[in-house]
Amino acid sequence: MTSALVLAGGLGTRLRSVVSKLPKPMAPVRGRPFLEHLLDYWIHQGVNHFVLSVGYLHELIIDHIGSNYKGAMIEYVIEESPLGTGGGLLLGAQKIGHDKPFLVLNGDTYFAVNLEKLIAFSNIHNTDWCFSLFTATEAGRYMGMDISTQGVINSLKSTTVQGGRLANGGVYWFHPRALHQIGFLPGDKCSLEEDIFTAAFALRQCMMGIEFSGFFIDIGLPMDYHLASKLVPSEFTS
């Protein structure tokens, strides 16, 4: 079984002006919830078990997706109050288990990553965290990372400010052993990017990244949400 945790518990406040009364992953794109497009892609890549970490208006997600989506098993963990991306990971990891790696996905990001290639790279280097990276062309929009030629993450925040740098694409192949020493527990509110990654880096956990050139879009801002309706690939949406 190949499992993925989808971080879908955010409030989506930046998108509220154009998508009201819906959790962000349920925002309609080409007549269907964005979450369906996300699940379709990763099912195509071989994922057959999803855990959705949900919070704001979670009933709408659970009622729509259910416990089985196109043959993939769907489970849920519910954030009774917003826990942040790190808190969602801690909660979801309990459901999946601590003995084998799994995929971690941002619920508002579509990034066409080759899962087989991501896993192979992680296995070769025995990573705790394997990041999927993309080339950010918008200066100042995405925080770049300093990466060695071998893929080792030397810094979580790049000192380079111009476009064309490698940035975090919000898709990770992750081994839950990495959580044992970081100092956060299930139920804690924390950020994956600011808290958990920072702690993992300080502990010298194996953090590496590999670049992918597949389609990338983050629907967190109204401008990009409108763009998604035109650009999200359709080959996995039927």
Each language-model region and where it sits:
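Catalytic-core segments of class I nucleotidyltransferases/pyrophosphorylases
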Residues: 103, 110, 116-123, 137, ...
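Short catalytic helix/loop segments, enriched in acidic residues and glycine
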Residues: 21-34
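Conserved N-terminal catalytic core of the sugar/cofactor nucleotidyltransferase
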Residues: 2-6, 14, 32-106, 115-117
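Conserved beta-strand termini and adjacent loop/short-helix elements that scaffold enzyme active sites
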Residues: 55, 77-79, 132, 156, ...
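A short, conserved acidic/glycine-rich loop-to-beta-strand motif
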Residues: 125-135
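Short acidic-glycine loop/turn motifs at beta-strand connectors
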Residues: 146-152
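A conserved hydrophobic helix/loop-capping motif in glycosyltransferases and polysaccharide synthases
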Residues: 5-9, 27-28
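Short, high-confidence coil segments that cap the C-terminus of an alpha-helix
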Residues: 47, 99, 126-127, 204-205
